[in-house]
């Protein structure tokens, strides 16, 4: 029998979706949440890192997830996609039987012990992850980790958390960064500082690093540690310098545990903040200031030359490229560049003044949600609409469908005046030629992560 739908196959429904709710001019936007995010869309631009990737920055650390099978699917795939990542990842499945019996502590101790005993080489550090279910049932993690530390005194254990439904105080990213430095213990103080907690090593050419080295300081960069001994050496530092707002709880936790001063020198694109960062570091750490005027003249010279090349090309920026997307937009706009869209879902408190400036002086700047459910259906055709779009960030490249893009993730180690100069060079190179591998690049999870 031939059915009706075989002779007349149903047509694929065509939807007409308006951008209302998913896009808004900054002049009409509210701070700090310009969008109501309910049902969320996840784009295939996946270069940003997650809690499955960041523990791999600790040399010799082995991740063990003790979770329900449904929760494990995502992290298993994330770890397996990373080069050599699967070898540093294990799992213990939480079952209904464990929930009914209430033996959560016993199964976690036995499961982690079994994995450690079967490993060909004993890890120096283990980060064990618990999920929401254990915490709903009040698992006693003190019993778990005290037992494991007594059983394996040669291993440092970190309590990791995959509890997105229990975000009472910290987001998963903030909590994950804090736990990454929990295995660092006090050591006799040396003339040294730490950079915490970035996912990319800080570029050594930047003026802050030069200042510190000229002042006789050793620098322990969390993301640049090659051995577990280098990671543990962070315990000897006098101060923790952090550039990301999300790294604040990690630095303050180390201040409390290790008696190391927390020093916030944020990423920035305005000269006032860049100069203030250096002045603060110089005052607290006893350093000589570099010639900030010379750096600012160099930036102005480079940005003028870049503007002549880029012209009125449409530019879009996204929040995965930089923690200060509005700050970067402001810098480019006041220098005459045609920034027309910024992709973000919320606005950092650090960018409140920048948000208000853009509201007043550039009210037509489009803010676009990356997670709003409409983003799945809205057209991604800006590169055809405007002729050419230059994207800064992977999500901006995907949503505008352009191959002219700067592959930047969380500033990619760029910092300060020197970082801004290098970013301008990257923008210039991206404007010169298409990257034919754009779609392949943006689908690689945790860009730059290696097991």
Label every model-predicted segment.
Residues 1-451:
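An N-terminal assembly and electron-transfer interface module characteristic of large anaerobic redox
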């Amino acid at each position: 029998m031939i059915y009706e739908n075989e002779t007349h196959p149903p047509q694929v429904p065509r939807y007409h979706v308006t951008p209302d709710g998913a896009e808004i001019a900054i002049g009409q936007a509210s701070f700090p949440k310009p969008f109501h995010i309910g049902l969320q869309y996840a784009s295939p631009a996946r270069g940003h890192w997650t809690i499955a990737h960041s523990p791999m920055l600790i040399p010799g650390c082995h991740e063990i997830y003790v979770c329900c099978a449904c929760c494990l699917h995502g992290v298993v795939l994330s770890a397996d996609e990373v080069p050599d990542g699967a070898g540093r990842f294990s799992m213990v499945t939480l079952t209904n039987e464990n929930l009914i019996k209430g033996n959560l502590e016993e199964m976690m101790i036995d499961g982690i012990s079994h994995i450690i005993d079967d490993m060909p080489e004993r890890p120096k550090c283990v980060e064990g992850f618990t999920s929401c279910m254990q915490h709903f049932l009040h698992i006693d993690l003190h019993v778990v980790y005290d037992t494991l530390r007594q059983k394996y005194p040669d291993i440092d254990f970190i309590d990791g958390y995959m509890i997105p439904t229990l975000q009472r105080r910290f987001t998963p990213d903030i909590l994950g960064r804090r736990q990454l430095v929990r295995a660092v213990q006090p050591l006799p103080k040396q003339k040294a500082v730490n950079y915490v907690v970035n996912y990319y090593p800080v570029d050594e050419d930047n003026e802050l690093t030069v200042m510190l080295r000229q002042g006789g300081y050793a620098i322990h960069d969390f993301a640049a540690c090659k051995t577990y001994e280098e990671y543990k050496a962070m315990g000897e530092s006098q101060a923790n310098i952090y550039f990301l707002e999300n790294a604040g709880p990690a630095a303050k936790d180390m201040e409390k545990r290790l008696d190391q001063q927390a020093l916030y020198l944020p990423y920035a694109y305005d000269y006032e903040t860049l100069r203030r960062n250096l002045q603060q570091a110089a005052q607290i750490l006893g350093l000589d200031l570099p010639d900030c005027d010379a750096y600012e003249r160099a930036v102005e010279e480079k940005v003028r030359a870049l503007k002549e090349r880029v012209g009125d090309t449409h530019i879009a920026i996204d929040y995965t490229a930089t923690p200060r997307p509005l700050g970067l937009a402001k810098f480019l706009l006041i220098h005459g560049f045609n920034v027309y869209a910024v992709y973000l879902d919320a606005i950092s408190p650090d960018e409140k003044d920048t948000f208000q400036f853009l509201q007043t002086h550039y009210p037509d700047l489009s803010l676009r949600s990356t997670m709003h459910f409409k983003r799945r259906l809205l057209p991604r055709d800006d590169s055809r609409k405007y002729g050419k779009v230059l994207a800064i960030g992977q999500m901006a490249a995907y949503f505008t469908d352009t191959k002219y893009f700067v592959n930047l993730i969380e500033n990619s180690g760029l910092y300060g005046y020197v970082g801004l100069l290098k970013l301008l060079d990257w923008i210039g190179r991206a404007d010169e030629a298409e990257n034919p591998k754009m779609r392949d690049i943006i689908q690689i999870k945790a860009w730059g992560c290696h097991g």
